[in-house]
């Protein structure tokens, strides 16, 4: 995942993190020995822009096609600081995965109280 400035006259990268993947399968810092299948598929940004929530399952049939040995389930949080100009950091303490989801695949993040960007239309600013 990459973060770029929002200045169209002067775009530049201000942050980058890697998790999972088809070939690299980059591990989460909380479990460095555990190669992650899948990559961030569903992305939700907190309403204040300081947290990015990502999950790894897109659609079951596609997951099975691209990851025949299994995609598993994982959910990660990436922190950013818009006031400081950006930058991305994987939250090392937040990493539900595998058995935390009782065999289910994790697809989309829906947070009560409207913390995610897709909930913005439900709550007054």
Predicted region positions:
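Feature marking well-ordered beta-strand scaffolds used for ligand recognition
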Residues: 1-125
């Amino acid at each position: 995942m990459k973060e770029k400035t929002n200045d169209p006259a002067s775009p530049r990268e201000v942050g980058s993190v890697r998790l999972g993947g088809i070939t690299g399968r980059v591990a989460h810092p909380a479990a460095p020995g555990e190669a992650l299948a899948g990559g961030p598929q569903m992305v939700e940004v907190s309403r204040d822009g300081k947290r990015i929530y990502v999950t790894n399952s897109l659609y079951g049939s596609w997951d099975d096609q691209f990851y025949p040995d299994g995609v598993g389930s994982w959910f990660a949080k990436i922190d950013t600081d818009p006031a400081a100009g950006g930058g991305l950091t994987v939250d090392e303490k937040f990493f539900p995965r595998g058995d935390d989801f009782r065999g289910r695949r994790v697809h989309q993040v829906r947070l009560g109280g409207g913390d995610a960007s897709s909930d913005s239309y439900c709550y007054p600013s």
